[in-house]
Structures are given as C-alpha cells and as structure tokens.
A protein has these predicted regions:
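Nucleotide-activated sugar donor-binding and catalytic core shared by glycosyltransferases
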Residues: 1-66, 74-184
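Conserved C-terminal portion of the radical SAM core fold
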Residues: 71
C-alpha cells in the first residue's frame, strides 16, 4: 500500500474545498443542520429501492435539510413520485470543489459511492453507505463509514444512532497524506 491517489487530489484542493463550504451553503440557502445524499448505483435506482431510501430520509426532513445532487434517473423518480418537502433540496451535479465543500461541513453523508466513502473518511465526516457491502473496507475499519443497506427501518435506526453519537471520528489512515504519487 502506497496510499490513495484520490486522497492526493483532495489534499491538493483541501484549502479551496474548506473555503468553498460557507460559499456553497450560502448559494444554496442551507442555513441549518444538513445531510448530503448521493444515490447513483443502478441497484438503488429502482422505484422500489428509492421508495425505501426516501421513506427513511423523510423521517429527518423536518429537523435536517437534505441535499441531493441528483443523477438523471434519480431526478425522474423524484418528479414521478412527488418526493417534495421544503427541506429536501434536489440539485444539479456540483463541481468537485463545491461538492466536497458541502460534504466537509455536513452533519452526515448517506451514499452508495465508493469514492465518497473515502472522501468522508479523510474529511472526518460521518458516512452511512446505502449498500450491503463496500469495496472500501478501510473506511469502515479505520474511517467514519458504516455500511447499512437500504431497508427503511435500518436507515432510520442508523441515522438516529449516528447523529446522536460522538462516534465516527476516524483514525488517520497510513499513507492517506497527499503524497501517494511521490511514493509511486
């Protein structure tokens, strides 16, 4: 293991990412506590599976703003199924800097993205993975990630447990220091 090249990119842009955080929240009118949610895997984009995920998210939409940069198939589901709430924000995809700026100061990230599991771990942001497994196990063993699946009751339980806990402060992962390319 020589490191993680994706973390090199994050480290190289970290100052811009952190600076972007307040700017992007202001631009998007995010004023309180919020979750960032990304769903893009075909297995999660069926109407049945999205219904389970959104039922879990809606339980928290009165207390938290829920920000979703949306995949086109996800937008279609949202439009077809009237998934509207004043605290659910459906966005067009954001730039890398703005997206990670938003992630860096979020209360929680829910995702099915492997890369985002790594980025949240490095940014020390709590992450719940909407899958039954991960190809990034280090994000669970040493990071801030927990794999929870997509069953509504499990999503509700894990969000409650995670936001109420002090948990999720990951450890510094060896070689995730922005110097992977030098070691290669």
């Amino acid at each position: 293991n020589v490191g993680n090249i994706m973390i090199d990119t994050l480290e190289k842009n970290l100052e811009k990412i952190l600076k972007s955080s307040d700017q992007i929240k202001e631009k998007l009118n995010i004023t309180g506590k919020y979750f960032v949610v990304t769903i893009h895997r075909p297995s999660n984009l069926s109407d049945e599976n999205l219904a389970k995920i959104f039922a879990g998210l809606k339980e928290f939409s009165n207390e938290y703003q829920i920000v979703l940069p949306a995949h086109p198939r996800l937008k279609k589901y949202i439009n077809d199924n009237d998934v509207e709430h004043e605290n659910i924000f459906i966005l067009n995809p954001l730039s890398y800097i703005d997206f990670l700026g938003l992630v860096s100061s979020s209360d929680l990230v829910l995702t099915d993205s492997g890369g985002l599991q790594e980025e949240t771990t490095h940014l020390n942001v709590k992450c719940l993975t909407l899958r039954n497994e991960t190809e990034r196990p280090i994000t669970v063993s040493e990071g801030t990630n927990k794999v929870i699946g997509i069953e509504t009751e499990k999503i509700i339980y894990e969000i409650n447990t995670t936001i109420q806990s002090k948990l999720s402060k990951g450890t510094e992962i060896k070689f995730w220091d922005g110097k992977t390319s030098e070691r290669i």
